[in-house]
Regions:
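C-terminal lid/capping helical subdomain adjacent to the catalytic/cofactor pocket in oxidative enzymes
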Residues: 129-176
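Active-site substrate-recognition segment that forms the wall
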Residues: 1-38, 42-130
């Protein structure tokens, strides 16, 4: 290959890239089945809403357009031997019951997990190993927008395209 772009976020340390600068967290979410009209009335018949924590690992609760409740209130350092999916679902159940005791009987329709990567100082990683290998990651839960920005900047860097996007990304303080 002429140039390589490495964008594996939480797996950067597994490739010996900035090995001591980040660690993976696993976040788990659950979503209820659709609430009935009666169940919606019990919780005040709300319009769709969402509450997101200012911290990437904080709780997220949403009431969706199709009358479901989505909750994420778990974040765990990812060690396969210590992660317990069922414990996370129990925490979701407890959170739902505390926030919405009127509908604590409602089952979850689906649950899932995903990885994020975090650094000690909350900053991402971006750079190159040499003139042919470029990397980016550790978005600290910054979401799709931040990862897309860094992905595009990796391409700009690999193609030696100096532009405002690359300047923005290169101005970030580096993770430590």
């Amino acid at each position: 290959a002429k140039k390589i772009i490495i964008a594996v976020n939480s797996d950067l340390p597994n490739l010996n890239i900035k090995k001591r600068f980040s660690f993976p967290l696993i976040l788990t979410s659950s979503i209820t089945r659709r609430l009935t009209s009666n169940e919606c009335n019990l919780i005040g018949n709300p319009a769709p809403w969402g509450v997101l924590s200012v911290k990437p690992t904080g709780a997220t609760v949403r009431f969706t357009n199709d009358h479901r409740i989505m909750i994420r209130n778990t974040s765990n350092p990812y060690f396969k031997s210590l992660y317990n999916f069922d414990d996370c679902i129990k925490k979701h159940r407890d959170g739902l019951s505390k926030r919405f005791p009127e509908i604590k009987h409602v089952d979850f329709d689906n649950s899932w997990s995903g990885m994020i990567s975090v650094s000690r100082n909350g900053n991402p990683l971006f750079g190159n190993i040499d003139r042919k290998i470029f990397y980016g990651g550790v978005y600290n839960g910054g979401g799709l927008g931040l990862s897309a920005l860094f992905g595009a900047a990796m391409i700009d860097s690999a193609l030696a395209k100096n532009n405002s996007r690359l300047n923005i990304v290169e101005s970030y303080p580096e993770a430590n």
